[in-house]
């Protein structure tokens, strides 16, 4: 018996790619906090192998689920403790701080402007008042009584008194500047000195000459100003002498280096016990008229002055 090998017949079928099916389902509730369930379902089908002898087919299905919690803020309706930021602009804090700083700067600027205006107004008022006083001084008599004048009669009297005081001060200052007694540094007759020797007697005699000339020119000053009378001045000199005698001893007859008031010759010679002020100018200067016999009768200082100037020969 002959055995034959049996070879089964196989038919090849074209295989397709596997198909993947995914299904996702989600649900969310806004009114109540709920959980959403996500389910995924995938189904895969394997390729089928068919043959003439037998055919097989298989399929697989898988599913998964994930729970996710959702947070929902509470509603602002009817709740005063929750700030509703939707109704206010962004940067509210910065706007409030900037408004406060701006208000401070604006108040400082307003204060500066007001103070400057008030000071300028006060200055203008004072300057206008001073100009008006100087401009209308002495013209109140000619002004009409119907006009409103800001200056009264008392003001006019005070202006006249000020003018009189200024004129008297000017006259006294001119008189005092004209003669500075017993000051060889400031006296005009010492400007052209040819020697360095200072003669007290010569200065006294020259001062008496200039003082007598000046008295003849300005005698009206003594009439207008009672403070320049000789009697008043002598009383003042006596009081000063009493005060000085208590502090220091009596000084010798020497020229004073400080300026004195007018008519101080009598008080000066009285204080120094000198009789030169009682001698007339002609007799005080008579010794210089005869240079031949002057060295026997004139003072030693004048003789030495003549020798130094070349008017006397030893």
UniProtKB/Swiss-Prot annotation:
UniProt family annotation: Belongs to the PRM5 family.
Top-level taxonomic group: Eukaryota
Name used for this protein in its record: Vacuolar membrane protein FOSTERSB_4073
The species this protein was found in: Saccharomyces cerevisiae (strain FostersB)
Region (Disordered): 32-60, 240-309
Disulfide bonds, paired cysteine numbers: none
UniProt membrane topology term: Single-pass membrane protein
Ranges annotated as biased composition (Basic and acidic residues): 254-269
One annotated Gene Ontology cellular component of this protein: fungal-type vacuole
Transmembrane segments: 93-113
Keywords: Membrane, Phosphoprotein, Transmembrane, Transmembrane helix, Vacuole
Subcellular location: Vacuole membrane
């Amino acid at each position: 018996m002959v055995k034959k090998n049996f070879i089964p017949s196989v038919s090849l079928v074209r295989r397709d790619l596997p198909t993947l099916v995914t299904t996702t389902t989600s649900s969310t509730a806004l009114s109540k906090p709920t959980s959403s369930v996500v389910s995924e379902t995938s189904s895969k089908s394997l390729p089928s192998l068919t043959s003439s002898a037998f055919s097989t087919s298989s399929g697989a299905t898988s599913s998964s689920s994930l729970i996710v919690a959702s947070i929902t803020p509470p509603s602002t309706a009817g709740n005063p403790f929750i700030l509703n930021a939707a109704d206010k602009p962004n940067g509210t804090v910065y706007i409030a701080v900037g408004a406060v700083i701006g208000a401070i700067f604006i108040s400082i600027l307003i204060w500066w402007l007001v103070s400057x205006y008030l000071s300028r107004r006060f200055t203008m008022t004072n300057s206008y008042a001073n100009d008006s006083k100087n401009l209308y001084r002495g013209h109140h008599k000619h002004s009409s009584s119907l006009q409103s004048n800001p200056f009264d009669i008392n003001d006019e009297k005070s202006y006249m008194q000020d003018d009189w005081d200024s004129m008297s001060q000017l006259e006294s200052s001119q008189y005092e500047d004209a003669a500075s007694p017993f000051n060889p540094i400031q006296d005009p007759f010492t400007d052209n000195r040819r020697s360095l020797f200072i003669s007290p007697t010569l200065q006294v005699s020259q001062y008496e000459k200039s003082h007598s000339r000046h008295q003849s020119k300005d005698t009206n000053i003594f009439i207008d100003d009672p403070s320049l009378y000789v009697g008043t001045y002598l009383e003042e000199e006596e009081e000063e002498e009493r005060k000085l005698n208590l502090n220091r001893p009596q000084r010798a007859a020497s020229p004073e280096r400080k300026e004195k008031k007018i008519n101080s010759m009598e008080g000066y010679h009285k204080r120094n016990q000198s009789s030169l002020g009682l001698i007339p100018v002609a007799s005080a200067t008579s010794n210089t008229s005869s240079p031949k016999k002057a060295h026997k009768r004139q003072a030693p200082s004048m003789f030495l002055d003549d020798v130094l100037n070349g008017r006397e020969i030893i």
